[in-house]
């Protein structure tokens, strides 16, 4: 499944292609591009940290690796993602990256635990309200996508005709 977009990966995994086509044609494509590629607000690489946090909590190895790869591509370094994969939420990151990861993990683990103190911590490290919204959206989108990836079944591989 290397190099597949999230909608393609879900289509690849599903045992009900009609459902996956609906999913990929509509909701995910619109949300994915609106949330991850929108101009302004949080940087693309920081949105990827939010998605990595969600994918780690949900144990979606495929998605975590895709987001890590994208983060490394955007920043031209795999230092941050290597630290995250080695030490999880305790990774020694910049204050801003650490706060982004911590919040995305908390939001993914137990959404109702996210509170004013978390928002204040994000503001303390320099995030504005628009960036915080982008973080909530990117983390939530991939928390949802991770859950779908886990339950749609095993990958459907094309059969080879040996005639």
Model feature map: region roles:
Residues 1-163:
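Hydrophobic alpha-helical segments
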């Amino acid at each position: 499944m290397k190099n597949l977009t999230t909608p393609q990966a879900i289509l690849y995994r599903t045992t009900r292609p009609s459902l996956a086509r609906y999913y990929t044609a509509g909701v995910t494509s619109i949300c994915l591009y609106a949330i991850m590629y929108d101009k302004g607000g949080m940087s693309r690489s920081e949105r990827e940290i939010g998605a990595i946090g969600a994918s780690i909590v949900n144990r979606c190895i495929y998605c975590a690796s895709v987001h890590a790869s994208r983060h490394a591509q955007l920043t031209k370094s795999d230092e941050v993602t290597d630290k995250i994969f080695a030490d999880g939420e305790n990774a020694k990151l910049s204050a801003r990256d650490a706060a982004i990861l911590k919040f995305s993990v908390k939001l993914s683990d137990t959404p109702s635990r996210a509170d004013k103190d978390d928002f204040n911590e994000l503001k303390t490290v320099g995030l504005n309200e628009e960036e915080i919204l982008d973080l909530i959206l990117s983390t939530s989108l991939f928390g949802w996508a991770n859950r779908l990836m886990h339950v749609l079944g095993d990958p459907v591989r094309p059969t080879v005709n040996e005639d």
